[in-house]
Amino acid sequence: NEETIAVFGLVNSTVFQDFPKLKIIVSHGGGAIPYQLGRFEAPSLRRGTGKRFSDGLRQLYYDTVLYTEDALRLLIKTVGADRCLFGTECPGTGSSVDPVTGRSMDNVKPMLENIETVSAADKQKIFCDNAKAVFNLK
């Protein structure tokens, strides 16, 4: 998907060296990047530049528009809570309801609130503090 391609291209470019103050927020939790991290990390190590793909991921920010708790947990584990910003697609495709469970697909807020392995401080970062920092808000 397009998020995966964009993240791969940005991390493997010099854009953050050329524009060190640039802040980019990637939609949909970075696409397949967290799930396929090992496949992207291996070539970066093979190049022998000393630059790990996973370190480059932490130069970007990611929204939490992911529809499963497992995907959300993996994103936070992969890039860190300080690189995640709360996001939603409601109304829109996120308004879809799973006919089996009755759950709205884009119920990120309660889903994140109920992940016990994410601390209250990290939840505060994701819901509020990170956006304030990215957009220089008080």
What positions do the PLM features span?
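H/E-rich (His + Asp/Glu) clusters that bind or coordinate divalent metals
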Residues: N1-T14, D18-F19, K23-K138
